[in-house]
Amino acid sequence: MATVTNFKLVTPPESSRADKPGATKASDAFQEKKSVSVNYDRGEHEVSVNIGGLRKADIPRRYRIRVENDRFQKDWSVSEVVDRLMALNRWEEVDGVLNSWVGRFARKNFPVLIRELSRRGCIELCVNVFKWMKIQKNYCARNDIYNMMIRLHARHNWVDQARGLFFEMQKWSCKPDAETYDALINAHGRAGQWRWAMNLMDDMLRAAIAPSRSTYNNLINACGSSGNWREALEVCKKMTDNGVGPDLVTHNIVLSAYKSGRQYSKALSYFELMKGAKVRPDTTTFNIIIYCLSKLGQSSQALDLFNSMREKRAECRPDVVTFTSIMHLYSVKGEIENCRAVFEAMVAEGLKPNIVSYNALMGAYAVHGMSGTALSVLGDIKQNGIIPDVVSYTCLLNSYGRSRQPGKAKEVFLMMRKERRKPNVVTYNALIDAYGSNGFLAEAVEIFRQMEQDGIKPNVVSVCTLLAACSRSKKKVNVDTVLSAAQSRGINLNTAAYNSAIGSYINAAELEKAIALYQSMRKKKVKADSVTFTILISGSCRMSKYPEAISYLKEMEDLSIPLTKEVYSSVLCAYSKQGQVTEAESIFNQMKMAGCEPDVIAYTSMLHAYNASEKWGKACELFLEMEANGIEPDSIACSALMRAFNKGGQPSNVFVLMDLMREKEIPFTGAVFFEIFSACNTLQEWKRAIDLIQMMDPYLPSLSIGLTNQMLHLFGKSGKVEAMMKLFYKIIASGVGINLKTYAILLEHLLAVGNWRKYIEVLEWMSGAGIQPSNQMYRDIISFGERSAGIEFEPLIRQKLESLRNKGEGLIPTFRHEGTLL
């Protein structure tokens, strides 16, 4: 049986502690009495606060006589009345409870009742009780009641109602005091109405009411939370000029203003000033600094600060916000395991994660498409008694979109509606991306239309998502439609949207349209960035417009836009395609001097440039530089280097590079195989070539027909007909398509070695595959039979060709050769 122990602790209010020993009975009636209940078996404890208030014995005698014999009148304490009111259903009236309460005849109970209801946070119940209170005959309007009501409305962002109470209290002859203005400024600040808050401060000064530090703090917060950090600093300066010194709360609000205004560097500078003034920061201060460091990309400094907070727990102990900020930092860096570890450390230290913490964890999983793990986190949220919000469902929806499950994403969307969670614009954008990124453009457009029907206004992110889907479909008509839809809805495109549209046009091979859109972007004074020029330069190279690509580089330099690795690589590609190796070397050196370390793409572009200009030695030197700088080559770089080895007279190095690719598990491509076969041909390494055929099985389906024909020709030209036929059989088995050119290569080399039987067999294969042999193929075999086959085999060749003609039902042409009719 559970063991329960009850304790009663009496904690007098601050005012009564200063009272004399002969305190009035009324002051004792409003003392807070704490009751503690401990269940040792379950390891639970509960603390409740009870306030008695003025009871039946304390009300005037005329009211006491009136309720003396009425069995419906109850002598409840104030806490009991609050509990009964909270137990009412939403549709039940409060009059039934309040009219049965004897304490209603003591007007001093009214402020305490409003205060206790305000603490519970039930605004609708509090409003109904206040309405009932105002119709009581013994009610007297008081400032403290109105101040509590205005503060409660501010907590729930009911700004208009709070202003209504402000004017109502003046009608009831209650003069607003500093606390009233403080509460109303706080209400406008929460709603982002900082100009209203500034006007209230002016009204306060005109009324000769001296603002307190709390008033200034609320006004600074009103400006700062709206992103107006300059106005917040002006108010702070005015505060010190008026002789009101800032406290730690003021400093935290200023830091928060910098954070809201995205002035992260200024926030760090202000923090240094705080340390110079020996202001001791608290957990809130460090939370803001960690956030700013994360936004500036200084993750190591943020982690150092977090670790120092954990080491000095007595001074500033990390709270849920601190851990959540670090989780978000790891999520942005893509370090999911560390994000999960921080979450588990938070739980291990006894902190209870809130919905924001769970959403940060789900967001980390969603970015990587880990839908199963994200779903399990949602289950943990519900299991711990937390109600998932819109962000939770949006993260889960996004995880399904990233894992290529748009159907599951739509199910989550419908589940949100079923559970009465209204999707916002971010939710719709995630659903549009789920369909668009997986090639379902029609469904993405339908979601866009449904979004408008549901009263959610699309934003520029919605347009960007649709444009990205159009880019995958490679249809310029869709791009035009999306752009016109954005224009008709008054959506102004930003840089990211223009980049998506320009990229979509280029993917649809509409370079002129892309250039026209870029010029429109410049006319509308939308600032282009490095991504814009990367798309234009790479697109121009793809369309073989190399001079135009290079002209964009000069335009970037004129606009003082910093060059990125992608821009340098695209320009290197343009120079290499034109054979301008000197200019390519200049750009490559400029890239290194600018502190932009070349990546594998830049090195590959330079390898192609050296190959095009037949500078094989420099290509080999460049590869050594790649290795020295720790750049891992990819398949394209390896094929370019192999070509340099073959052309530069170092075919043996091709095999060394091939072994390196195997060791580092770099995938082989068709170009790589061709260069290896070329090296085998040069060095007469036919055993290695035959072994290579065995290794080609997994790669054959991905090889082009032109490349397979080249490899067949390489074997045939070297007289390795058996290896050629072996490769041909593997090509057929892999399902790769073959054409007339493939058969022509086989026939040419079979005839060159005198294998006329296989020649005729290949002709039969062609007939069976529905490919009609050319006239020249028949002339070649007939000529071979007459000149080289001898008297013994020439009639046999004619007989087989005649049989083949009969099977082909006239497909084989009849022609005369040296007086002989076939």
UniProtKB/Swiss-Prot annotation:
Region ranges (Disordered): 1-28
One GO molecular-function entry: structural constituent of ribosome
PPR repeats: 106-136, 142-176, 177-211, 212-246, 247-281, 282-316, 319-353, 354-388, 389-423, 424-458, 459-493, 494-528, 529-563, 564-598, 599-633, 634-668, 669-699, 704-738, 739-773
InterPro entries: Pentatricopeptide_rpt (IPR002885), TPR-like_helical_dom_sf (IPR011990)
GO biological process: chloroplast mRNA processing; embryo development ending in seed dormancy; RNA splicing
Listed NCBIfam families: PPR (TIGR00756)
Family designation: Belongs to the PPR family. P subfamily.
Protein name in the entry: Pentatricopeptide repeat-containing protein At2g41720
Organism in which the protein naturally occurs: Arabidopsis thaliana (Mouse-ear cress)
Gene (UniProt): EMB2654
